[in-house]
């Protein structure tokens, strides 16, 4: 029986590392009846964390998508279908969070009642603002030492600049935490410890909390009154609002991102999660509540698709995963129309057709095969060939490109070498698959050393990649230290003679050239000019001279790094009828270039990165001081809602370990991005140290 669209909820559960997000998701699956034994994260058995690395590290890396059904704590609703995307909270995996927010309609943000609004939560909040995702908040871990519900509420106001509306107050805190008060019903809720909170009862509000409850209920009424003129009139005349009126008003205000309803509880102690599920149904949007999806057609004109089964099919692929049993899985969100297995769809970003074979609905890591996917749903397709993250799948005759997701460039690189010859080919396949899954991870072969270089978003990111390579593909690899790619260039023009002569009985070797070597402007590259007149060196030998010069340039002249941006003119020389050969002239060219380059003031160039740091104002001085210590040149500053933005140019060599240092200097509240800017001459003392190493 297909669920009507208005009964769908596509939500994400997002939070900072350790706020208890995975435990919350586990409880959701338990109460909605999808999982019969509660998986605890600290046992390494949580259903949503299905990669071995996640269970070992106790953090969530891949966002698994899960479907469950809920009809309310009091069975007061029709059965709603909730699709949940679990998102990671570690900064090296921000990309996963961004991907999942893109395809959600709403989110539950989990905060730790002790730690409050942590840096990562600020980042998640900013991303949710960027995509306009309505959200409700669950203040978790109310049973922990130092739990302080109202402090978290004030941080949501101050740090995140949002308008929280408190719908529940805790009864007690720390080990005294008993349950919650529903401020709309004005009843206390006690969950039954015996059956893990499956049953509960409403009781009267404890006398000592009555006054506080009245005060917070008044805030709810005040917020609800903003919804319509009728309610405002009722409010001004001092009339009571009905429960239905309050909920309708709050639903509208939440979906339009004007308020954020706040719930509290302890997922671990089985208190409060069912009320959050009710909140998902009551306050978060169904696919029909969100604006029509926008895109462009093949001519680049803007078009809209309604969330309806009657529209042409369109969907966005938001995650590619390799599954040990079925191969490549493409997770996608259907925005319009209906897709049946066996259909052919068009990947409008790549311009390729794809036939849809099996369609799966995922429950954490068990799967159910389905015949069709309808608008508003989230599912996975098996074995698509051309699709990567952010691609659009659509009807062949009604082409649409939904917006692309932008992914940052990787900032750190390390060399990986297979431990054995047998691992060589396997490693190539494994890295290719992992790069397809994760757009923020890249692989290339260094032409100079022949090494395989992997690049990613941070040191943890690459550790996990190497770890997955070992576990999922059985490839053992040695990992090098993070590396910087230097270059060399020349600063002065010289003329140089080069001779290569060998006589040892029989045929000798003879090569003789004159080269003019000059610097070019940065980025111009290598240029070779043949200015030989009167055939002093025959035409057929000229390419050999050029080749000799280029080989020497690749090997460098001072530190073994490639020489860039030079112009070489071959203007004179001589040859011997018998002894001259291509080989002899190549060696003459190569030696001549090296001797000349050493006189042409060779210098070392280092890559400079454009770095942008977003930091709360309090840490501004520390951040600037640290950038100066790293030989950074501050280019400018500006204000943003998240604090100050500092832009600087910093040598890549000074940026290793920066994310860790920045996190500790700002208690993790600052974030940064960096990308390649240019090559610039390295200061003498730095260059000397590098040359010595060689």
Curated annotation (Swiss-Prot):
Similarity remark: Belongs to the TRAFAC class translation factor GTPase superfamily. Classic translation factor GTPase family. EF-G/EF-2 subfamily.
Pfam families: EFG_C, EFG_III, EFG_IV, GTP_EFTU, GTP_EFTU_D2
PANTHER family: RIBOSOME-RELEASING FACTOR 2, MITOCHONDRIAL (PTHR43261:SF1), TRANSLATION ELONGATION FACTOR G-RELATED (PTHR43261)
Function: Catalyzes the GTP-dependent ribosomal translocation step during translation elongation. During this step, the ribosome changes from the pre-translocational (PRE) to the post-translocational (POST) state as the newly formed A-site-bound peptidyl-tRNA and P-site-bound deacylated tRNA move to the P and E sites, respectively. Catalyzes the coordinated movement of the two tRNA molecules, the mRNA and conformational changes in the ribosome.
GO cellular component: cytoplasm
Residues annotated as binding GTP: 15-22, 86-90, 140-143
Native organism: Legionella pneumophila (strain Corby)
NCBIfam families: EF-G, PRK12740.1-3, PRK12740.1-5, small_GTP
Domain tr-type G: 6-288
GO biological process terms held by the UniProt record: ribosome disassembly
Full protein name: Elongation factor G
GO MF: GTP binding; GTPase activity; guanosine tetraphosphate binding; translation elongation factor activity
Alphabetically ordered keywords of this record: Cytoplasm, Elongation factor, GTP-binding, Nucleotide-binding, Protein biosynthesis
């Amino acid at each position: 029986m297909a669920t009507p669209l208005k009964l769908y909820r596509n939500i994400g559960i997002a939070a900072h590392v350790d706020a208890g997000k995975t435990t919350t998701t586990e409880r959701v699956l338990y109460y909605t009846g999808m999982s019969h034994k509660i998986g605890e994260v600290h046992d390494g058995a949580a259903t949503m964390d299905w990669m071995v690395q996640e269970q070992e590290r106790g953090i969530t890396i891949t966002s698994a998508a899960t479907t469950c059904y809920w009809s309310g704590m009091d069975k007061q609703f029709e059965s709603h279908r909730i699709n949940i995307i679990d998102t990671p909270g570690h900064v090296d995996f921000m990309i996963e969070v961004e991907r999942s927010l893109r395809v959600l309609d709403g989110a539950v943000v989990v905060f730790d009642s002790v730690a409050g609004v942590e840096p990562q939560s600020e980042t998640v909040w900013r991303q949710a603002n960027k995509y306009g995702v309505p959200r409700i908040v669950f203040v978790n871990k109310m049973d922990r030492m130092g739990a302080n519900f109202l402090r978290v509420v004030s941080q949501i106001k101050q740090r995140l600049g949002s308008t929280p509306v408190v719908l529940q107050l805790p009864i007690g805190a720390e080990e005294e935490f008993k349950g919650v008060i529903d401020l709309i019903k004005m009843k206390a809720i006690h969950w039954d410890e015996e059956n893990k909170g499956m049953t509960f009862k409403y009781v009267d509000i404890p006398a000592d909390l009555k006054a506080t409850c009245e005060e917070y209920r008044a805030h709810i009424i005040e917020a609800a009154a903003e919804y319509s003129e009728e309610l405002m009139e009722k409010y001004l005349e001092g009339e009571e609002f009905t429960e239905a009126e309050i909920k309708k008003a709050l639903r509208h205000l939440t979906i339009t991102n004007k308020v954020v309803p706040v719930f509290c509880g302890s997922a671990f102690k089985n208190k409060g999660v069912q009320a959050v599920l009710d909140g998902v149904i009551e306050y978060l949007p169904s696919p029909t509540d969100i604006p029509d999806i926008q895109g462009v057609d093949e001519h680049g004109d803007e078009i809209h698709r309604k969330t309806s089964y009657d529209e042409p099919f369109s969907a966005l692929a938001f995650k590619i995963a390799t599954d040990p049993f079925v191969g490549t899985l493409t997770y996608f969100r259907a925005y319009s129309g209906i897709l049946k297995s066996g259909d052919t769809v068009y990947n409008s970003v790549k311009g390729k057709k794809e036939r849809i074979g099996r369609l799966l609905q995922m429950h954490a890591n068990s799967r159910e095969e389905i015949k069709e996917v309808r608008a508003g749903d989230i599912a996975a397709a098996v074995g698509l060939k051309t699709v990567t993250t952010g691609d659009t799948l659509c009807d062949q005759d009604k082409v649409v490109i939904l917006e692309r997701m932008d992914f940052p460039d990787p900032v750190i690189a390390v060399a990986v070498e297979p431990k054995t010859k047998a691992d060589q080919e396997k490693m190539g396949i494994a890295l290719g698959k992992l790069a397809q899954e994760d757009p923020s991870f890249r692989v290339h072969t260094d032409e100079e050393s022949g090494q395989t270089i992997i690049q990613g978003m941070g040191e943890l990111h690459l550790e996990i990649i190497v770890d997955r390579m070992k576990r999922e593909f059985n490839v053992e690899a040695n990992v090098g230290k993070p590396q910087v790619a230097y270059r060399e260039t020349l600063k002065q023009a010289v003329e140089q003679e080069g001779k290569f002569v060998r006589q040892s009985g029989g045929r000798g070797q003879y090569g003789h050239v004159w080269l003019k070597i000059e610097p070019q402007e940065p980025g111009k590259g290598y240029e070779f000019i043949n200015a030989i007149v009167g055939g002093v060196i025959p035409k057929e030998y000229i390419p050999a001279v050029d080749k000799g010069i280029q080989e020497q340039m690749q090997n460098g002249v001072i530190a073994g790094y490639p020489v860039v941006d030079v112009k070489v003119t071959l203007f004179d020389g001589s040859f011997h009828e018998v002894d001259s050969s291509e080989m002899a002239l190549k060696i003459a060219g190569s030696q001549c270039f090296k001797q000349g380059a050493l006189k042409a003031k060779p210098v070392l160039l280092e890559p400079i990165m454009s770095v942008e740091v977003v930091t709360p104002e309090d840490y501004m001085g520390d951040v600037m001081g640290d950038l100066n210590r790293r030989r950074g040149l501050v280019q400018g500053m500006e204000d943003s809602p998240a604090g100050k933005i500092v832009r600087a140019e910093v040598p890549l060599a000074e940026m290793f370990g920066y994310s860790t240092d920045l996190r500790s200097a700002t208690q993790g509240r600052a974030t940064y991005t960096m990308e390649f800017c240019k090559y610039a001459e390295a200061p003498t003392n730095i260059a000397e140290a590098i040359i010595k190493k060689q």
